[in-house]
From Swiss-Prot:
Cofactor descriptive note: Binds 1 Mg(2+) ion per subunit.
GO cellular component labels: cytoplasm
Protein name: Thiamine-phosphate synthase
EC number: 2.5.1.3
Sequence positions that bind 4-amino-2-methyl-5-(diphosphooxymethyl)pyrimidine: 34-38, 66, 105, 134
Pfam families xref list: TMP-TENI
Free-text function comment from the UniProt entry: Condenses 4-methyl-5-(beta-hydroxyethyl)thiazole monophosphate (THZ-P) and 2-methyl-4-amino-5-hydroxymethyl pyrimidine pyrophosphate (HMP-PP) to form thiamine monophosphate (TMP).
GO biological process: thiamine biosynthetic process; thiamine diphosphate biosynthetic process
Species lineage: Bacteria, Pseudomonadati, Chlorobiota, Chlorobiia, Chlorobiales
Listed PANTHER family: THIAMINE BIOSYNTHETIC BIFUNCTIONAL ENZYME, THIAMINE-PHOSPHATE PYROPHOSPHORYLASE
Keyword Flavoprotein: no
Catalytic reaction list: 2-[(2R,5Z)-2-carboxy-4-methylthiazol-5(2H)-ylidene]ethyl phosphate + 4-amino-2-methyl-5-(diphosphooxymethyl)pyrimidine + 2 H(+) = thiamine phosphate + CO2 + diphosphate; 2-(2-carboxy-4-methylthiazol-5-yl)ethyl phosphate + 4-amino-2-methyl-5-(diphosphooxymethyl)pyrimidine + 2 H(+) = thiamine phosphate + CO2 + diphosphate; 4-methyl-5-(2-phosphooxyethyl)-thiazole + 4-amino-2-methyl-5-(diphosphooxymethyl)pyrimidine + H(+) = thiamine phosphate + diphosphate
């Protein structure tokens, strides 16, 4: 089950220990953790996944593995997040079954429609703002484009890309269910405090809409 909106998803940073970062983000109030480490081998990913899943259960949070359906299943993760060039969504759904979460990265309305059709439980949409973790040649889609996606799909949208404490409210106000961050937490002097501040900003958005 996707966390209640609005929520913070933290994606691990390859430059630091994913277990330490996940723990800090969870202690700061993150509701979802995604393990993303392109260069790690299967053995390392599995052991990280087992450890992070245990942390997520302790904090009643969702644990997602990036790309690797096999690791997600072996470690008992809550789900998997797939990119456009990863295992096809319909094939992944057959392996995952109906109970595990499947998210898909999208950057256009057509990709979002296809993701929902192929069984995605949520889409990660972006990049919303300029970011160092994505191809800088690609133009940011901007928070206003979230409304276009929300108008054509029924599954939750997680906004990603260049989100910081200064702009975190904009994707939520545009219709995103949550925000996903890497650097805003991982590269902060204190990742726990950074996560807590982002969660606080999201909570203020709830109060703003009352």
């Amino acid at each position: 089950m996707i966390p209640s909106s609005p929520f913070l998803c933290f994606i691990t940073d390859e430059s630091r220990s994913p277990i330490i970062l996940a723990r800090k983000a969870l202690e700061g109030g993150a509701s979802m953790i995604q393990l993303r480490h392109k260069s790690a081998d299967g053995d390392q990913l599995y052991h990280w996944s087992v450890a992070i899943q245990a942390l997520c259960r302790k904090h009643k949070a969702i644990f997602i593995v990036n790309d690797r359906v096999d690791i997600a299943l072996a470690a008992g993760a809550d789900g998997v997040h797939l990119g456009q060039q990863d295992l096809p969504a319909d094939a992944a759904r057959k392996l995952l079954g109906k109970d595990r979460i499947m998210g898909i990265s999208v950057s256009s309305p057509l990709e979002a429609l296809a993701a929902e059709k192929n069984g995605a439980d949520y889409v990660g949409f972006g990049h919303i703002f300029p970011t160092s973790s994505k191809d800088k040649k690609n133009t940011p889609v901007g928070p206003e484009s979230i409304a276009d996606i929300k108008a054509i799909i029924t599954i939750p949208i997680i906004a990603i890309g260049g989100i910081t404490g200064c702009n975190a409210q904009l994707p939520i106000r545009a219709g995103a269910a949550g925000i996903a961050v890497i650097a805003a937490v991982s590269r902060a002097a204190d990742p726990e405090i950074a996560a807590r501040e982002l969660v606080g900003i999201l909570q203020k958005n709830i109060e703003h809409n009352r």
